[in-house]
């Protein structure tokens, strides 16, 4: 009951999210062809259909990649457990957030063996985590319901992002990472093109009031937005920024485009995840000219 009330409140606060879910539910039911689906999905986000015969913008090129550059190895790179192993093999263990375990079933988790604090999420899904700061107060029933709900999801179908289609749903529990001073963690998301960082976004206030700012490789603020407003205060260049660039580029070698998400916690860099289609290729740039500018960096493969 409380969960239902929470969903209703969330829908009231964000009616556009409700409309999007309704539209995509109808689209998934009616349109099975991937190309037709991608075109209508793009239309919903940007108000027009993409030019897939001669894509020019960043969003159009992401849509083209979804349909034409399907590499099976990408599946492991988006699996939240396998991606850590992929990164570990390239950059080493020092940059990987410790994992306490991975399970196929919630019932198999031995919570008595876990530390007092941890983070629980699923390996195939996105957009949520469960943070436990005191195991004695951890609501297992609520967590189990959230996991069961997540296990029903397959991110492939929402935007036709093919790497997610065959990711096995599992539960992963990791160490809770905390910034000294109590500030929330910042997400640093590096947009890599053929193994080179061209820009990054910094996400702040993720749990309360999400703000997103874009920067070029030299950490100069870029004058555009995508979906979220800019931060209220200037964002300082993080410590070990050059190391973050180095790690992102090591992980993106040989890939036309991938977003490498990193954390910089108390001066230590940690790998987060990898994303091949930022925003699903359906999120507007404001102003629109930046969709074309960023699109120039993405060189589509000939395969």
Describe each region flagged by the PLM.
Residues 51-135, 142, 149-162, 170:
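A conserved helix-loop-beta module that forms one wall/lid of the active-site cleft
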Residues 103, 124, 175-177, 192-194, ...:
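Short, flexible loop/turn elements at secondary-structure junctions
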Residues 84, 107-110, 126-131, 139-140, ...:
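Short catalytic/ligand-binding loop motif for oxyanion handling, primarily in non-cytosolic enzymes
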Residues 166-170, 214-269:
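A long amphipathic alpha-helix within ATP-dependent nucleotide-binding catalytic cores
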Residues 94, 183, 192-198, 255-257, ...:
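Coil-to-beta-strand transition motifs
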Residues 264-303:
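C-terminal active-site "lid" helix and adjoining low-complexity regulatory extension at the edge
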Residues 114, 138-228:
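Phosphate-binding site of ATP-dependent enzymes
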Residues 1-69:
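Membrane-proximal basic amphipathic "stem/tether" segments
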